[in-house]
Amino acid sequence: MKNPKMTVIGGGTGISIILKSLRNEAVDITAVVTVADDGGSSGELRNAMQLAPPGDLRNVLLAMSDMPKFYERVFQYRFNESDGALAGHPLGNLIIAGISEMQGSTYNAIQILTKFFHITGKIYPSSEQALTLHAVFKDGHEVAGESSIAKYQGMIDHVYVTNTYNDQKPQASRKVVEAILESDMIVLGPGSLFTSILPNLVIPEIKEALRQTKAEVVYICNIMTQYGETEQFSDADHVAVLNQHLGRDLIDTVLVNVAKVPQAYMNSNKFDEYLVQVDHDFAGLCRAAKRVISSYFLRLENGGAFHDGNLVVEELMNLVRIVKQ
């Protein structure tokens, strides 16, 4: 039997936790990664060179490779604040930016680095051009730019994306639509709902592919609420927002952590964008999705509450075997 095909969609921090474990399984992986980041090193490089931001893609490259730890530290090395124009830039971002300039696009750069790192899966930016994320709040106010959205004190109604450097309609990267249509399973998240997952899904071609695919669509719900995005959200609220943006109820299965996060990890100063544990609304989830898998997916590490990638992937593999039958 052929390996199942799984496409994982989101931002570099959240989905990397899943990809690190998933790469060890007998599965054909495609990662589709957001290009809406406009803060920090990625924002500086995209503005200076008008390229798709490299940071999320850098993290996914590392998650899907089996390079020695030292090489990983080299790729992730961040220049010191005293290093002038290089200050704050991870070396990997500069490498991606350099190859992007040589080869004409970030898409081409990632394909070259995928081969260089002997990665067996596929990694695609969701779009081949940098995108600007726009958030429309329930009070009617609109904010442009991912890094600015969380700073506005309000509840987000919906988000959309535009091309940053031209007036053309945002388009999916080559092969992304094909990957979605050919997948046995689509995995959304984990990661920031409005600023990491949805920037990919609201690209019209990706939204339409998700409507057409016969794949099982799985959402890995966040463990913690997020400042400026999902304050006071339940897990069912997360799913409702996804379905709202997709235009219909497309989430087949939701994976939800039910392990209790210790109080010491709430409102952490170390991870100041995260607030408290997401409320579990089992009845609401059952109305919003066909299948709910509630289990202990929690890993406490370095002062933060994260998904245990191995436990999540174990459930995903069990599920994909069922849907492929």
UniProtKB/Swiss-Prot annotation:
GO MF term set: LPPG:FO 2-phospho-L-lactate transferase activity
| Pfam families documented for this protein | CofD
Q: What Gene3D superfamilies has UniProt attached to this entry?
A: CofD-like domains
Q: Does the keyword Cytoplasm apply?
A: yes
Subcellular localization is given as: Cytoplasm
Q: What does this protein do?
A: Required for morphogenesis under gluconeogenic growth conditions.
Name recorded for this polypeptide: Putative gluconeogenesis factor
Query: What organism is recorded for this protein?
Result: Streptococcus pyogenes serotype M3 (strain ATCC BAA-595 / MGAS315)
